[in-house]
Amino acid sequence: MKMKSIYFIAGLLLMIVQGSWQNPLQDTEEKSRSFKASQSEPLDESRQLNEVKRHSQGTFTSDYSKYLDSRRAQDFVQWLMSTKRNGQQGQEDKENDKFPDQLSSNAISKRHSEFERHAEGTYTSDITSYLEGQAAKEFIAWLVNGRGRRDFPEKALMAEEMGRRHADGTFTSDINKILDDMAAKEFLKWLINTKVTQRDLLGEYQ
């Protein structure tokens, strides 16, 4: 009985000692866990704060960049529109300034060309009439002097033959007059039917 009681007491003592050892160990483990948790919580919070800051900074930077890009685009579009308006206005002003000058220059050139045509036509008509009259007079005088019969060989030969056959001077004179009249008529007919220009007449009588 004594031995059993001793063993029983020894077992109780062992259980008490083990319980006393386990409680401090558990306390230390819990304290270490709580300490680790308390240290890890600020780290997690600071990490989350940093992530939130980075996210907010990135979002703000992105939004600000988009705003600046849109503002630059608007400024560029306004600059283009103002430049285009100024260019169109300047072009219209230049065209408006040139338009009266063009009208006046066209009117002056038109009047000048009409005056030149009128003067040239009048001068050509006058010089043509004068040269025709002079040519007719000179040609008739040339025929009367007997130097134009080469242009009409058949009629000239006939007149010469008739002059040789007939010694009568009156007949020969009448034939010469007839030939002169025929030559003058043919020359005038040639002048009428032929388009004689001022250059040809001036070149012929220079």
UniProtKB/Swiss-Prot annotation:
GO annotation, biological process: adenylate cyclase-activating G protein-coupled receptor signaling pathway; adenylate cyclase-modulating G protein-coupled receptor signaling pathway; cellular response to glucagon stimulus; gluconeogenesis; glucose homeostasis; negative regulation of apoptotic process; negative regulation of appetite; negative regulation of execution phase of apoptosis
Region (Disordered): 27-57
Annotated GO MF terms: glucagon receptor binding; hormone activity; identical protein binding
Residue span(s) of the pro-peptide: 86-109, 151-163, 199-206
Regulation: induction: Produced in the A cells of the islets of Langerhans in response to a drop in blood sugar concentration.
Residues making up the signal peptide according to the UniProt record: 1-22
One term under GO cellular component: extracellular space
Pfam families: Hormone_2 (PF00123)
Keyword field: Amidation, Cleavage on pair of basic residues, Hormone, Secreted, Signal
Gene3D superfamilies in the cross-refs: 6.10.250.590
InterPro entries attached to this UniProt entry: Glucagon, Glucagon_GIP_secretin_VIP
Site (Cleavage): 54-55, 85-86, 111-112, 117-118, 150-151, 165-166
Localization of this protein: Secreted
Free-text description of this protein's post-translational modifications in UniProt: Proglucagon is post-translationally processed in a tissue-specific manner in pancreatic A cells and intestinal L cells. In pancreatic A cells, the major bioactive hormone is glucagon cleaved by PCSK2/PC2. In the intestinal L cells PCSK1/PC1 liberates GLP-1 and GLP-2. GLP-1 is further N-terminally truncated by post-translational processing in the intestinal L cells resulting in GLP-1(7-37) GLP-1-(7-36)amide.
Bias type Basic and acidic residues, positions: 44-54
Modified-residue entries (Arginine amide), positions: 147
Recorded family membership: Belongs to the glucagon family.
Protein name: Pro-glucagon
UniProt organism field: Gallus gallus
